[in-house]
Amino acid sequence: SKELVKQRMEGIQAVLSGTPVTIVTSLDGFMDHLAPKESIEEKVLKIQNDSVLKLDEMAERLSDVGYDREVQVEGPGQFAVRGGILDIYPLTEEFPVRIEFWGDEVDSIRTFDVESQRSIENMTEITIYPAVEFPQGEEKGVSFLDYFSKEDTILFLDEPVRLVERGQNIEEEFLEAQKKRLENGYELEEEEAKIFPVADILKKINTYSSIGFFALEMKCRGLEVRE
């Protein structure tokens, strides 16, 4: 869903910002295939006052990174073009943004209210993150865990045994669903239609510094535990 992608992209935005951040996720949150961090960074659009941009090319770029073109912006992940005005609701922002052009030059940037369409606040720049986790043109996915530096990251694992059990259940359900889709004639070649096996994620986790919180059982198959 768009809301789920929004939450994940907010997490990605926080990680890419370079500032210390705490991310809360589940083990299966590491199992999804995402575009590599470098690819997401390349597709982030930064627009400033006085930037020189062609509106039609801008609209095409927004479509390429997952934004839906509409007659009027009503929710996150949408954009609209009216004359020399570009309205866009960035997935990671609280309010939509109206960008007015003078020819090919950005004349003004301001947030606005969806209901009243009235301006809220002038801005000097806006950073627009993709509206999809796997933009067009990507062929190989990575885990969200790969976004984190091993040198600067500590993983806190709450009840590792339960985390692994949940991940295994998710994997089994996913594989069963994929099997049924194949039986019904669907093609499953897209990278985003895959997940990483739990075993692979556990191997990745073992390469990071981590602290586990166990209620009872101190052993967890696949995880290296040191007391």
Where are these regions (language model features)?
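ASCE RecA-like P-loop NTPase motor cores
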Residues: 1-227
